[in-house]
Design a protein with these regions (language model features):
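N-terminal Sec-pathway targeting helices
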Residues: 1-17
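Solvent-exposed, non-transmembrane regions of membrane-associated and secreted proteins
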Residues: 18-170
């Protein structure tokens, strides 16, 4: 009888731990998903890839395209939503395309999105002691190395795989 009670208690504790862990995993997944959707929406609304524009001036011409793609950002629109935007970081080969935030406080955007909502992913942001016009000798931009490969998550592959650089040069 005592063994049955102990087994039942262990079972309840085990199920409670599984439920608790599942809840937290769901919360993390949901947070990642919300952040991804927020930044995808920003990119769709405010970033225009020049290589995808239908420009009449280049139709029929033999002009060579540059080795990179330009991207036009509607900074006025972005700043109307959040005046802390100071730039946009874009690496086409790494799917890195995010607004760069600045508050002067290195911890403010660590866990806040562009919309100033709490999120594990936070934002990509400029070092608090840097100038917002990027005129410093060295400008430091912070961002998370996310497990779902968002933000700066894909940059780790440059260190892990020597061939990755060859196929993902900017």
């Amino acid at each position: 009888m005592v063994k049955k009670v102990i087994r039942f208690i262990v079972l309840i504790i085990g199920l409670s731990l599984v439920a608790y862990s599942g809840y937290h995993l769901f919360k993390i997944y949901s947070d990642y998903n919300t952040s991804d959707k927020t930044y995808e929406k920003l990119q769709d609304e405010y970033a225009v890839d020049d290589s995808k524009k239908d420009d009449d001036s280049t139709k029929g011409s033999e002009a060579q395209s540059p080795w990179y793609d330009d991207i036009d950002i509607d900074f006025a629109g972005l700043r109307s939503e959040n005046p802390d935007v100071v730039g946009w970081i874009y690496f086409e080969n790494e799917d890195i395309s995010y607004p760069v935030m600045y508050s002067g406080d290195n911890s403010y955007y660590l866990r806040k999105t562009f919309k100033r909502e709490h999120a594990t992913a936070g934002s990509i942001f400029l070092e608090g002691s840097n100038k917002t016009d990027f005129s410093d000798c060295h400008t430091i931009i912070y961002g998370h190395n996310m497990k779902n490969l968002s933000m700066f998550g894909k940059l780790k592959y440059y260190n892990r795989d020597e061939n990755y650089y060859d196929s993902h040069q900017y």
